[in-house]
Amino acid sequence: MVVIRLSRAGAKKRPFYHMVVTDSRKRRDGNYIERIGYFNPVARGQEVKLHIDMDKMTHWQKVGAQLSDRVSALLKEHSKKSETAA
């Protein structure tokens, strides 16, 4: 099954996550099919905390990719911010 989930990167005590499309049997930080965004939980000031390429996200969801729990929560948060900004 194809899933959209977070892959950890960054230094110790400074996490940074790539939002990736991957096979569910692969390791968390292993090979992936496509990178579609990123999440920086420790963003400061004007740094972007969450970036998602929505065209790629909708494409993979139409193809049948499942969202992880954390990614679906981040997507909800992202859509709320988009609505309030618009």
UniProtKB/Swiss-Prot annotation:
This is Small ribosomal subunit protein bS16. The keyword Acetylation does not apply. It comes from the Bacteria. Coiled coil: none annotated. GO terms for biological process: translation. GO terms for molecular function: structural constituent of ribosome. Keywords: Ribonucleoprotein, Ribosomal protein. One of its GO terms (cellular component) is cytoplasm. It comes from Legionella pneumophila subsp. pneumophila (strain Philadelphia 1 / ATCC 33152 / DSM 7513). Belongs to the bacterial ribosomal protein bS16 family.
